[in-house]
UniProtKB/Swiss-Prot annotation:
Active site: S99, D229, H258
Keyword Oxidoreductase set for record: yes
Binding partners and assembly: Homodimer.
Entry similarity comment: Belongs to the AB hydrolase superfamily. Bacterial non-heme haloperoxidase / perhydrolase family.
Class in the EC hierarchy, top level: oxidoreductase
Species of provenance: Kitasatospora aureofaciens
Protein name: Non-heme chloroperoxidase
Keyword set, alphabetical order: Chloride, Oxidoreductase, Peroxidase
Gene from which this protein is expressed: cpo
Segments forming domain AB hydrolase-1: 26-264
Pfam families per record: Abhydrolase_1 (PF00561)
Length: 278
């Protein structure tokens, strides 16, 4: 299997599993919590059919990548992404992040610039700043909320994932219509296969402050979000994000949950392909 080494922990290397398919302009897809690069399958198929080269990789601690106990912060995640881009020598690339993966996109552009990057897309994003503070009243929740997530993951991450995916896909509305029990089970299995340390460390990165990163986005951008997102509510994320980045193309998918890559794949793919074609 293909791996890219991004670091070292004690006697073992930290390797990221990746897949690289197709030809044409490269599109790098960066997954969300607690999934893997395979969560992009409905977008990967559409992009390949449209003539793009599609690269997915599993973030450290997730999927088939190494499961280290270090490096769970967006500076390191962005450095890992930079290593992927440099190792594959990608040029004129499009970075597409989903949920937690949008943080890599913002921090990469802020830290490494856009010499290799043509466009960026933020799907169900966590920007600009999830933490509710005195100077950020639009934040989604106080730090205690995220501390509670960490505690629940440490207590029984498998039970946590079951509840998490209920709201991730809005199963009370979409199960049996827009998503099957089998697809939900696959998401749970993917989550369970990731590392225990990453599962608890990841939520502490969600309240990273990206407000200083946003002005450095100097390439065409897409912000796309579901109005029914219970995980990262649109009023705390995409709508505030768009005000901070008014040049971005902005799309709201009516009624879509956080996991809209699967439940509303047609709407997502239509908007993404139209953005890429411009």
């Amino acid at each position: 299997m293909p791996f890219i080494t991004v670091g070292q922990e004690n006697s073992t290397s930290i390797d990221l599993y990746y897949e690289d398919h197709g030809a044409g302009q490269p599109v790098v897809l960066i997954h969300g919590f607690p999934l893997s690069g395979h969560s992009w399958e409905r977008q990967s198929a559409a992009l390949l059919d449209a003539g793009y080269r599609v690269i997915t990789y599993d973030r450290r601690g997730f999927g088939q990548s190494s499961q280290p106990t270090t490096g769970y912060d967006y500076d390191t995640f962005a450095a890992d992404l930079n290593t992927v881009l440099e190792t594959l020598d990608l040029q004129d690339a499009v970075l597409v992040g989903f949920s937690m993966g949008t943080g890599e996109v913002a921090r990469y552009v802020s830290s490494y610039g856009t010499a290799r990057i043509a466009k960026v897309a933020f799907l169900a994003s966590l920007e600009p700043f999830l933490l509710k503070t005195d100077d950020n009243p639009d934040g989604a929740a106080p730090k205690e909320f995220f501390d509670g997530i960490v505690a629940a993951v440490k207590a029984d991450r498998y039970a946590f994932y079951t509840g998490f995916f209920n709201d991730f896909y809005n199963l009370d509305e979409n199960l049996g219509t827009r998503i099957s029990e089998e697809a939900v089970r696959n998401s749970w299995n993917t989550a369970a296969s990731g590392g225990f340390f990453a599962a608890a460390a990841a939520p502490t990165t969600w309240y990273t402050d990206f407000r200083a990163d946003i002005p450095r986005i100097d390439v065409p951008a897409l912000i796309l979000h579901g109005t029914g997102d219970r995980t990262l509510p649109i009023e705390n994320t995409a709508r505030v994000f768009h005000k901070a980045l008014p040049s971005a193309e902005y799309v709201e998918v009516e009624g879509a949950p956080h996991g809209l890559l699967w439940t509303h794949a047609e709407e997502v793919n239509t908007a993404l392909l139209a953005f890429l074609a411009k």
